[in-house]
Amino acid sequence: MDKIDLLLQQIDFPIFYLKVVLSFVFSFLITWYSIPTIIKISRRKNLMDEPGQRSSHERKIPNLGGIAMFFSIAVCASIFAYQLFDLYKFLFASLVILLYVGVMDDIVVMRAYKKLIAQIVVAALLVIGSDVRIRSLFGVFGVYELNYFLSVIFSIVTFIILVNAYNLIDGIDGLAGVYGVICFSLFGISYYRLGEYNYPLVILSTTIIGTVIGFLYYNLSDRSKKIFMGDTGSMLLGFLLTFTSICFMDIFIVKKVQGAVFYHLNTAPVMAIAIMILPIIDTLNVIIIRLAEKRSPFDADKNHIHHKLL
């Protein structure tokens, strides 16, 4: 990959900005060109989302758009932000497992407990294997540094909650995608302002933004082109948003890492939560309503915020 950097350096343009532009353009194009093939195969094999009582659509729609999103992110991040896979060695493996789980759920609908077990494995792989964890709450609720065991458990639970919370907001066309673009834009700008050590995370953010915009072109199109991201796409975005949130908080932890600059910000957890506030509030809202009605918090209904706004 160093040869790619050397090649890009031959162009009279700052290499970081060139990577940002190329990652956005290529991720958009890969998604944009991949989805028509996925739509064609989905229709031929009848791999479609059936309309139901809670559905916002009235006919069968292909729901494997998340496959194109994964492919685009994996290719572009591996080329333009390869440092992430050196630093977080289990990140790609986690995404591949999540892809498998998402596709299985989109095609045959997995049992909830099986999907939960898979999510725990994926989260544990990244948290323990790559040490991506919440180390401190910066004084929120009077809690500062967490011991290793508590940090691991809390981080895994956070991954599971946020991945599923993000999945829940994918109920109407464009919502999960547009919200993802907003969140990754905010994180990307924040990482850019926090110095060169975080530039790979900026490139990851622009890669995801390009990918999602390429998907939204079809998701918001007419019937012949429409496709959903499915659980594959929503879990992928939720997982990567949680990953970038924890990495954002980790910037403000004092640690000895070559090239890293220490910044002091006690409100880091609050800022990360604020960026992801919609899925968090929506999940709390539906759980409270279901418990108040003496129903299981896992029951499906139309009490989500986006359903109320329709």
Q: Which stretches of residues belong to each language-model region?
A:
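Alpha-helical transmembrane segments
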Residues: 2-41, 46, 70-100, 175-310
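Juxtamembrane helix-capping/reentrant segments at transmembrane boundaries
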Residues: 50-63, 226
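Short aromatic-rich membrane-water interface segments that cap or initiate transmembrane helices
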Residues: 56-62, 141-153, 262-272
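Aspartate-rich (DDxxD/NDxxD/DxxxD) Mg2+/diphosphate-binding motifs
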Residues: 57, 107-116
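Membrane interface segments of multi-pass transport proteins and intramembrane proteases
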Residues: 106-111, 137-146
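A generic, lipid-embedded transmembrane alpha helix
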Residues: 61-78, 124-130
